[in-house]
UniProtKB/Swiss-Prot annotation:
This is Lipopolysaccharide heptosyltransferase 3. CDD domains: GT9_LPS_heptosyltransferase (cd03789). One of its GO terms (molecular function) is ADP-heptose-lipopolysaccharide heptosyltransferase activity. GO terms for cellular component: cytosol. Pfam families: Glyco_transf_9. Keywords: Glycosyltransferase, Lipopolysaccharide biosynthesis, Transferase. PANTHER family: LIPOPOLYSACCHARIDE 1,2-N-ACETYLGLUCOSAMINETRANSFERASE-RELATED, TETRAACYLDISACCHARIDE 4'-KINASE-RELATED. GO terms for biological process: lipopolysaccharide core region biosynthetic process. Pathway: Bacterial outer membrane biogenesis; LPS core biosynthesis. It catalyses: an L-alpha-D-Hep-(1->3)-4-O-phospho-L-alpha-D-Hep-(1->5)-[alpha-Kdo-(2->4)]-alpha-Kdo-(2->6)-lipid A + ADP-L-glycero-beta-D-manno-heptose = an L-alpha-D-Hep-(1->7)-L-alpha-D-Hep-(1->3)-4-O-phospho-L-alpha-D-Hep-(1->5)-[alpha-Kdo-(2->4)]-alpha-Kdo-(2->6)-lipid A + ADP + H(+); L-alpha-D-Hep-(1->3)-4-O-phospho-L-alpha-D-Hep-(1->5)-[alpha-Kdo-(2->4)]-alpha-Kdo-(2->6)-lipid A (E. coli) + ADP-L-glycero-beta-D-manno-heptose = L-alpha-D-Hep-(1->7)-L-alpha-D-Hep-(1->3)-4-O-phospho-L-alpha-D-Hep-(1->5)-[alpha-Kdo-(2->4)]-alpha-Kdo-(2->6)-lipid A (E. coli) + ADP + H(+). NCBIfam families: heptsyl_trn_III, PRK10422.1.
Amino acid sequence: MRYHGDMLLTTPVISTLKQNYPDAKIDMLLYQDTIPILSENPEINALYGISNKGAGTFDKIKNVLSLIKTLRANNYDLVINLTDQWMVALLVRCLPARMKISQLYGHRQHGIWKKSFTHLAPIHGTHIVERNLSVLEPLGITDFYTDTTMSYAEDCWKKMRRELDALGVKDHYVVIQPTARQIFKCWDNDKFSKVIDALQQRGYQVVLTCGPSADDLACVDEIARGCETKPITGLAGKTRFPELGALIDHAVLFIGVDSAPGHIAAAVKTPVISLFGATDHVFWRPWTENIIQFWAGNYQKMPTRHELDRNKKYLSVIPAEDVIAATEKLLPEDAPSADRNAQL
């Protein structure tokens, strides 16, 4: 569990624990750079950060020793592990909790790993949310909360609304995040432009979002330049995760690829169009029924994980026309005239 989207997919575990143990204080250990996506969750008491992958060896050791000292002092009754990483198992060994649960990973059969926990739970489910929830089996819980949660403060939406007003965006807008961490998860820029044109011709304003990197911003710029009418790009690279959650929550539709914003859209119950390529589209799909998902494997055979070319856009086989048809299904009515006039 390394990335922002992964963190959202753990929230049903947090909610289920809080639902069954309402007086419990729930702390979470995660990578430092993923903290913002859960920073507004009211069910979490405290967030503790593990050094990111790029940190130096000395900084990592210092971070782990500091975490051990802090977490030991918290005197936990229960520790739940949702990752197969050795560092976490060794850290758990240092905590005096009465009950320590991990999932039973087939590739983690070493005695040191097994003895780091008091219980090893069999893994169940075809989706990561179901698999995460299966770790609670040793607790005998029967009442599960299965929705993901993306929390944000009211001030986040107030800020986004002010920004949207300044950009001339009305109520019926669509958020599109075309970028992902790796190119093999991305779709063609010109196809995004075609989808945007189709939406804007029906009166919907399109807000493009992305991360702050130069590559992400260049992608958004190229897509915008390929459109007949330029979409809204003023928020690209400028939203924190809670603000992005607020922005997507108030959108009429979200369109994206295999990345965290799709999971945010699912969590806030905004309709989703999601495009997947050479990744597990069942296991990692946004956890919602209000979704139209495109998998490149339905158009062309996808490579196995070991054959994957990370510099290839596998999503290119998905036609823009199919995605446009999906927008018409999820948004069967044109935007109200007030929104259409805002684009003039």
